[in-house]
């Protein structure tokens, strides 16, 4: 059956919709943008501690602590900041964790396969920012309420994993850029966690990088754009001896640690 001829008004509206970009679609999920760059933007050479389990050791002489958003109290964050520390708060932005306080707000339709080695976590369908956006914004708001200086969003490389969804590189870039813009709108610093293959496309959006085991897998060169942009690159090795990676990490101007996989208080710093 032939379609009726569209009216000029209808055609105009149709053409306007054709030009709507993904950025326009995402606008409702962002607050008014904070102009300027007043959030923390670390340069290479920042001493740090990454502790996500066990009793927090607050006695370290470091510039920055990376701690769990949900498990760390506002009073503990306040204590660290009173000592002159910057506090980054860990949150997973690409996986569902069944033990989190807000686990019940994620609909089943955005939950994918379980992460390899992590039976309590499932990949998220990051193409559904209409669903995940409000949830992640509430987490960022919690970071602001607790006094975090920034966030470490984990598992933001689902497109390159067996997530259970046919995620594309472009969908991942869109989601990761959205995370960065939403964090900055709240005056939060944000780091690019792993996702090495997209560093070139994301270095201008993120304030620093955090990597696990790039020396073990011989892929640290992919992080150099951050250092070249004057941005800190934090990282850890779990299995390698410090004698096998610290010298190279220092020469690349990376801030590297040797840590236990449990990310308890134990650490050895390369510099």
Where are these regions (language model features)?
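Glycan-processing catalytic domains of CAZymes
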Residues: 30-271
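Short, cationic, amphipathic peptide segments
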Residues: 26-28
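Bacterial N-terminal signal peptides
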Residues: 10-18
């Amino acid at each position: 059956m032939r379609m009726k001829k569209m009216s000029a008004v209808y055609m105009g509206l149709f053409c306007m919709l054709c030009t709507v970009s993904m950025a326009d679609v995402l606008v409702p999920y962002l607050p008014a943008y904070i102009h300027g760059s007043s959030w923390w933007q670390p340069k290479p050479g920042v001493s740090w501690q990454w502790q996500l389990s066990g009793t927090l050791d607050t006695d370290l002489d470091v510039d920055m602590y990376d701690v769990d958003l949900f498990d760390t109290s506002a009073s503990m964050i306040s204590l660290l900041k009173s000592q002159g520390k910057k506090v980054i708060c860990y949150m997973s932005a690409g996986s569902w964790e069944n033990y989190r306080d807000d686990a019940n707000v994620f609909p089943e339709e955005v939950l994918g396969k379980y992460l390899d080695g992590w039976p309590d976590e499932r990949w998220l369908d990051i193409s559904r920012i209409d669903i995940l956006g409000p949830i992640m914004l509430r987490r960022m708001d919690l970071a602001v309420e607790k006094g975090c200086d920034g966030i470490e969003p984990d598992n933001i490389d689902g497109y390159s994993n067996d997530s259970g969804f046919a995620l594309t590189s472009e969908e991942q870039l869109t989601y990761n850029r959205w995370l960065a813009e939403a964090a900055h709108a709240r005056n939060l610093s944000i780091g690019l966690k792993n996702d090495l293959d997209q560093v070139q496309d994301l270095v201008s959006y993120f304030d620093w990088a955090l990597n696990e085991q790039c020396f073990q897998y011989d892929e640290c060169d992919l992080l150099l754009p951050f250092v070249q942009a004057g941005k800190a690159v934090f990282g850890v090795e779990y299995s390698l001896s410090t004698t096998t990676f610290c010298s190279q990490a220092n020469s690349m101007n990376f801030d590297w640690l040797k840590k236990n996989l449990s990310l308890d208080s134990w650490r050895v710093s390369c510099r």
